[in-house]
Structures are given as C-alpha cells and as structure tokens.
C-alpha cells in the first residue's frame, strides 16, 4: 500500500488538490492525455490510505479497456487483494450485478441473459413478421436504432407511445408502427428473460427511480462514487 506522499508524487498542484480532497464533490476537467485517470486512481488510493474500506468505493468507466487499465493501476497502487475488493468496472458490468440482485422487482429472472446486437436484430425481425410489417420499410437495424435512441433517453415503450411528437415524427417518416414494434420487442425480451445493452441502463434507472428499497440498499453501500470520462454520459 502506497503512503500519501508516494500517491501524490509526480502530480502537479491542481492534481494533488483533487487527489487529496476526500470529502464533497470533485470535478476534473482536462484534455486528453492530461492525467485524469491517474488523478482518479490516485484519489482512490488516497481515500484507502485514509482508512476507507475498499468495498465502500464505486468506480465506473465506459469501455472494458479503460476498466481493465483502471484495475491494473489500482492493483499496482494498493495491492491486488485490496484492488479486487473495489466495486469497479464499466457502467454495464456494474449495473448488471445490481440488476441481477433486484431483477424480480423489474419482472426479470435473476439469471436474465444479455442480447448482443445480432440477437436484437433477430428479435426485431421476429416482431416485424408477427406484425405483418414489410422489413424493407421497417429495416430491422434502423428500427433497433430508433428503439436504442429512445432507451438512451430513458423513454420506455409506454412513454414512447404516449409521446405525440415522437409518434408524429414516425408517422411523417412513414413508419407509424415504431411505437408498437418497440412495445412488442420489449414484451418479448421480458418474457424470454432477456435484456439488451440499452435495457441495462434503462432498467437501472427505473430500478433506482421506482424501488426505494433498492435505492437505499445500493446507495448505503458506498461512501465514494468516482466516474472516469464522465463527459461521455448522456446527462
């Protein structure tokens, strides 16, 4: 385990200030290659040095590569044993853990499976066939893209159908059945015990919004939440 002076070594004044501020929010704004991830991992190590249990720290990032790099850095800085106890990974990988724990409250089995893009396209094709819709008009990949956009804006099938502007836009594009395809696709996924990648984010939002028990349980586990590349989030 590094001591505080070793953790701060090689950092400039602003970076040291960010690493050593262990209470309250901290926002790091800098260009590519400026050492943002180094500051984030340094801050985690500094917090651990102050006595925080590693399982009280949640660290999130976007890509598997970035998550692997963060884990490697932490193993070097604090030792492999402590690094393994940190709740650290991509948004999707961490959220999957939480969703499995509370899946039944969302209508899914805890053993739900994850659709990749190919699986989702096949499911959309099945929906189009069931609805007797022309897949040359409703191109499966385009339909999936529209559904993905809705989910990334936290729009459920019910909310989409109730959104007059969205329905009007689809009708203007000569694709008035998008809302119904979305609803059928979502129903089929839930019935099969399946989530796609966008569902992981959407359902995590729904879980924390609507399930106070889950919100309390998850929020009380962590004293610190750190996010790398936060500018890539939707909000």
Label for each model-derived stretch:
Residues 1-7:
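Conserved adenine-nucleotide phosphate-binding loops and their immediately adjacent elements
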Residues 125-194, 198, 212:
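Basic/charged alpha-beta structural segments of nucleotide/phosphate-handling enzymes
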Residues 30-32:
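The conserved Walker
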Residues 38-53, 69, 73-77:
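Walker A/P-loop NTP-binding motif
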Residues 9-20, 24-28, 39, 58-59, ...:
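Conserved helicase NTPase motor core
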Residues 94, 143-146, 150, 203-204, ...:
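Short acidic/histidine-centered micro-motifs embedded in hydrophobic/aromatic stretches
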Residues 56-61, 65-145, 155-159:
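Conserved P-loop NTPase-based nucleic-acid remodeling module centered on helicase motor cores
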């Amino acid at each position: 385990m590094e001591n505080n002076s070793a953790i701060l070594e090689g950092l400039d004044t602003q970076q040291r200030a960010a690493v050593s501020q262990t209470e309250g929010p901290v926002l790091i704004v800098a260009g590519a290659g400026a050492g943002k991830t180094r500051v984030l991992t340094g801050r985690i190590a500094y917090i651990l040095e102050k006595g925080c249990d590693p399982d009280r720290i949640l660290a999130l990032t976007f890509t598997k590569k970035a998550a692997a790099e963060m884990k490697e850095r932490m193993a070097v800085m604090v030792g492999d044993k402590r690094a393994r106890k940190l709740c650290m990974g991509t948004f999707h990988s961490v959220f999957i853990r939480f969703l499995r724990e509370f899946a039944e409250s969302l209508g899914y089995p805890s053993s739900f499976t994850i659709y990749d893009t190919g699986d989702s396209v096949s499911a959309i094709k099945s929906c189009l066939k069931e609805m007797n819709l022309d897949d040359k008009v409703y191109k499966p990949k385009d339909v999936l893209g529209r559904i993905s956009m809705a989910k990334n804006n936290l729009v459920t099938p019910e909310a989409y159908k109730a959104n007059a502007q969205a329905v009007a836009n689809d009708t203007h594009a000569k694709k008035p059945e998008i809302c119904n395809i979305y609803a059928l696709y979502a129903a089929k996924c839930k019935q099969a015990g399946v989530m796609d990648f966008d569902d992981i984010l959407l359902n995590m939002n729904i879980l924390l919004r609507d399930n106070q028990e889950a919100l309390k349980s998850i929020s009380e586990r962590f004293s610190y939440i750190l996010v790398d590349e936060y500018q890539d989030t939707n909000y």
